[in-house]
C-alpha cells in the first residue's frame, strides 16, 4: 500500500501516554507530521482545521468527541469501541474494528476525507431530533426539576 506523505496528525488533550507518544514520534522521525495540542478550550475551533476525526478507543461511554466533530461537520473514522449512539446518522461516521489492521484504517480515513460537506442546517436538525440540542437539554432539565417539585 502506498502511504501518503501529505498528512498531519493532530492530537488534542493530555494523558498518561503523551510522553511515550512524543518519544515514538521522534524515533520514527515524524515530527513534521504530528502536532501535540495538549488540553484546549477551543476544540470546536480546532475541528474546523481538520479533514477527518479518528477515534481509536477500545471503549467509550458515549463518544462525546465524535459528537463534537459531527456538530462541526467533520467526517469521522471510529473504532467499534465507540457506541453507535455517537453516530448522528449524517453520513459522517464510519466504523472500523481495531483489529482490522493498517490498510482498512488508511482507506477509511482517505475516503472520509473526500466526503461532501453536510449543511449546518441539516446537522442542527439531526442533533435536535436526537435530543442533543440546547433546547432539548433545557427541556430535560426543566422536566426533571418539575418532577422533583411534585415529590
Regions found by a protein language model. Give the residues of each.
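A charged, aromatic-enriched C-terminal amphipathic alpha-helix characteristic of glycosyltransferases
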Residues: 116-151
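A conserved nucleotide-sugar
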Residues: 1-35, 151
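Short hydrophobic beta-strand element within catalytic cores of glycosyltransferases
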Residues: 75-80, 85
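A short alpha->beta transition loop at the rim of the catalytic pocket in nucleotide-sugar-dependent
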Residues: 44, 51, 73
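Aromatic "clamp/platform" in nucleotide-sugar-dependent glycosyltransferases that forms part
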Residues: 39, 58
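Short glycine/serine-rich donor-binding loops of glycosyltransferases
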Residues: 63-68
